[in-house]
Amino acid sequence: MNTEKLETLLGFYKQYKALSEYIDKKYKLSLNDLAVLDLTMKHCKDEKVLMQSFLKTAMDELDLSRTKLLVSIRRLIEKERLSKVRSSKDERKIYIYLNNDDISKFNALFEDVEQFLNI
């Protein structure tokens, strides 16, 4: 690997590390949480999605374990960045979705990340 490619790779790492520390300090979130939040925006913005279905999709798309996904989802719900509701017909079924407040917080968070990264 030549020096230029190595420097580019190191630059990516520094940017990744800086972003990780920034969102942890400011929002108490991880990069996994951001990835899950972005995926929920793509799949749960317009309708409530069954948690099991979302987990399968997220495991495939994000290549994260079920445990890590559940931790991120729980954290996002606690931070009121994602909403959930239990089915009235079957208590075992849980749906996740983004309400208008969640979407506003999503947009503000990702605008802040864009400013931090200068993109």
UniProtKB/Swiss-Prot annotation:
Pfam families linked to this entry: Staph_reg_Sar_Rot
Main location: cytoplasm
Subcellular locations according to the entry: Cytoplasm
Keyword NAD belongs to the record: no
DNA-binding region(s), residue ranges: 55-78
One Gene Ontology term from the biological process aspect of the record: regulation of DNA-templated transcription
Record has Hydrolase as a keyword: no
Induction: Transcriptionally activated by MgrA. Expressed maximally during the stationary phase of growth.
GO molecular function: DNA binding
Transmembrane segments: none
GO cellular component, one term: cytoplasm
Keywords: Cytoplasm, DNA-binding, Repressor, Transcription, Transcription regulation, Virulence
Family (UniProt): Belongs to the SarA family.
Role according to the record: Involved in the regulation of virulence genes. Acts as a repressor of the agr locus and consequently targets genes regulated by the agr system such as sspA, hla and hlb. Binds directly to the agr promoter region.
Designated name of the protein: HTH-type transcriptional regulator SarX
Organism per entry: Staphylococcus aureus (strain NCTC 8325 / PS 47)
